[in-house]
A protein has these predicted regions:
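Beta->alpha loop/short-helix hinge microenvironment recognizer with preference
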Residues: 1-395
Length: 395
């Protein structure tokens, strides 16, 4: 379903331009092996912000000019469509934020497993996200590390800066958790949450065992030596409170494999884009044939129905009561530098602030009705909507 969100003005070469120019050639060469979600992504991105999706007609009361704003496709692989999604999704997440420290962890898999992950995406991506979160929960449950249940938000990424295949999971973890009796909030001990070496080996073992139990045929096709390869993970302190969470969400949740800002140019045969070399901390450029660029991009389009953002621990939907209790325990903590306990009136105020949770997910976002845009001719703000038109009925 097309969401009636008007697109912003176009600036520079965009992914949609590349899809329109090289998409037909790519489809003719590789169409038989494409997933339905990849075909849908090409079609949606090509139609995004064109008359194909319909749009709105506005009139400027300053210069009396009329102009069109076409609808976005809202495909999650489209880099142009994430602005309105980001704003609305963040509003929905406000009720789930806990006023505490946060940690950022990353779980990667050895390159020898990449072929298996690519061939069984729904199964193995889901396993990787689940076992990474389970490993964090199990380590945090030990009293020598935390002795409590944290909140975990897991995000799947499959790319590196050059659009290569690099599946890994980012985890945002609360710097503390609620104890088993539900009576206390146990904070993390400074900048330490769990030992990274133990976390890596635990994720590897849990992934191997889960795959063997749940998909024995897939497990049998993987050489035994692969499981002796080292898995790499890290976990570090990320920040405190809402700012840390919002920064994390903007950096990791609302990301596509490439943004329009990174696309530098396109000619009749090639695409040039920039990428960040994380080792040298410098920006590099790469020039690829257009079809190869689309091949790299499309390998990061996820199967239809796969949820790349998942919640575990305190943030799992089944833990609403515990999460609300954790929020209350954190709010009721005596402010730093004071010795006065909270009074009954303070408690009532806090209870009135208890957030109302929703079950809305990224896939369920509703319409985002924008305000009337500025006039592209004179820059005036006195614009008004004349009408909305369905697919292909615009000029």
């Amino acid at each position: 379903m097309v969401d009636p969100v008007a697109c912003p003005p176009k600036a520079g070469v965009e992914l949609a331009d590349i899809v329109r120019q090289f998409g037909p050639k790519y489809t003719s060469q590789y169409g038989q092996g494409m997933m339905p979600s990849q075909k849908r992504a090409l079609a949606d991105i090509a139609a995004c912000c064109t008359r194909e999706l319909g749009g709105r007609l506005y009139r400027c009361d300053d210069c009396h000019d009329s102009f069109w704003r076409y609808h976005c496709c809202r495909n999650r692989a489209c880099p142009k469509c994430h602005g309105s999604q980001t704003r609305q999704w963040l509003e929905e997440r406000q009720a789930e934020l806990l006023p505490c420290d946060y940690f950022h962890a990353v779980a990667t898999v050895p390159s020898e497993l990449h072929a298996a992950l690519r061939s069984h995406q729904k199964l193995m991506y889901g396993l990787l996200m689940r076992v990474a979160a389970e490993a964090v929960k199990e380590l945090c449950a030990k009293k020598k590390h935390l002795g409590a249940l944290p909140g975990i938000l897991a995000v799947l990424h499959t790319w590196n800066g050059q659009l290569g295949y690099h599946p890994h999971v980012h985890l945002l973890i609360t710097g503390g958790g609620i104890t088993a009796d539900g009576q206390h909030w146990e904070p993390a001990r400074g900048a330490f949450l769990v030992p990274v070496a133990v976390l890596s080996s635990k994720i590897a073992a849990k992934f191997r065992d889960a795959l063997k139990d749940e998909a024995p045929a897939v497990f049998a096709d993987i050489p035994a030596g692969v499981w002796r390869r080292e898995w790499v993970s890290f976990c570090k302190h990320y920040g405190h409170g809402n700012d840390a969470v919002l920064n994390y969400l903007s950096r990791y949740v609302f990301r596509t494999a490439i943004s329009n800002a990174r696309i530098l140019s396109m000619d009749q045969t090639h695409v040039t884009f920039r990428w960040k070399d994380r080792h040298a901390e410098t920006w590099q450029t790469e020039r690829l044939p257009g079809v190869e660029f689309l091949r790299r991009f499309l390998q990061h389009v996820l199967p239809r129905g796969f949820h790349k953002v998942r919640y575990y621990g305190l943030w799992h939907p089944s833990k609403r009561t515990e999460s609300n209790r954790a929020w209350l325990l954190l709010i009721l903590q005596t402010p730093a530098g004071t010795t006065e306990p909270l009074k009954l009136t303070d408690l009532l105020d806090v209870l009135g602030q208890l957030p109302q949770r929703t079950d809305q997910s990224l896939a369920d976002l509703g319409d985002d009705e924008p305000e009337c845009p500025r006039c592209p001719r004179c820059g005036g703000t006195r614009t008004r909507l004349l009408g909305e038109y369905s697919r292909s009925s615009g000029p």
